[in-house]
Amino acid sequence: MFKDRCQPKRCHLECIAFCPPQRTGTEVIWIGQETGKAEISEETCIACGICVRKCPFDAIRIIGLPEELKEDLVHQYGKNAFRLFRLPVPKKGSVIGLLGPNGIGKTTTVGILSGETAPNLGHYRRKKPHWDEVLDYFKGTELHDYLEKISLGDLKTAIKPQYVDRLNKVYRGRVRDLLGKLDKGGRLEALREPLGLPSFLDRDIGQLSGGELQRVAIAATMLKDADVYFFDEPSSYLDIYQRLQVAKVIQGLAKEKYVVVVEHDLAVLDFLAETVYLMYGSEGAYGIIAEPRPVRTAINVYLGGYMKEENIRFRDREIRFESRPPRGDWKAETLV
């Protein structure tokens, strides 16, 4: 259910009226007392799809999941809400990449790995997830030790957010003053030239372009004294030269730290990461994290749209890059 789209007061409750089991007396869809929105019983729903077609606000999706995935549920936001399956494993000394379309849980994944969100393992009714249960669930896996350190606060994290254009709404003042407050270890000097900061250090945050805000956000993240660094789309707004410079700086940071990068630019990801986790699913409904692959293999699989090992096709077409524009039929104009 897309709760933000569901508007029971503006429709005739078509989802309830046309539901076959509902019409025979089985409760499948009802309006929640707390939410005031339609809720669907996943146990009694027969997945006929009639409610999907009848809803005037396009608020319903019915998606069947493979049976084996039910054991891999890491986080669920609520009844009939988004679900995330599996997690990547950060590795100290290397850059881990996340690659996939928008709306399938990359931000949720970063939130869990950074400790901002405790995974509820599908128990969404609990107000506060139990870390002991989470650690027991991941016992014997590579991820257990990492999550244990996160839960105990033994790992400090720093996140470069995706939407850098909001930076000027939360901070006012000169770039130099902002970065100076964060520079506790005297590392700003080493970042000045690689990130091209000198040209706008003395300008106000509110006067910066998207590319300049991006570089300020990257510098601010790297100046924080952390053990784990997350960079959400660090190449956005940057030209090709700036992207490569940023990639080099992030690579240097990863020598002694955990680094996780969410990136859509395949060239930057190829240059930057060693291991990539592909993510696929349905936007706003669920996201699945595939097994790790070497970066070149992951990119080729992503372009092909088919994961041979998992026997999963996550895109109905292959992405191809032509070395030159395709030749079209050219017809000469008849002059006589």
What are the residue ranges of the model-derived segments?
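Iron-sulfur cluster-binding cysteine motifs and their immediate structural context
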Residues: H12-E34, E39, I50-E67
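ABC-family P-loop ATPase nucleotide-binding domains
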Residues: D72-R86, H123-G210, K224
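ABC ATPase nucleotide-binding domain "signature" region
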Residues: G97, Q214-T221
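Hydrophobic anchor residue at the start of the ABC signature
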Residues: T109, I218, V246
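Helical segment within the ABC ATPase nucleotide-binding domain
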Residues: R243-K255
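H-loop/switch region of ABC-family ATPase nucleotide-binding domains
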Residues: V262-H264
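Conserved beta-strand-loop-alpha-helix hinge in the C-terminal portion
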Residues: L278-R315
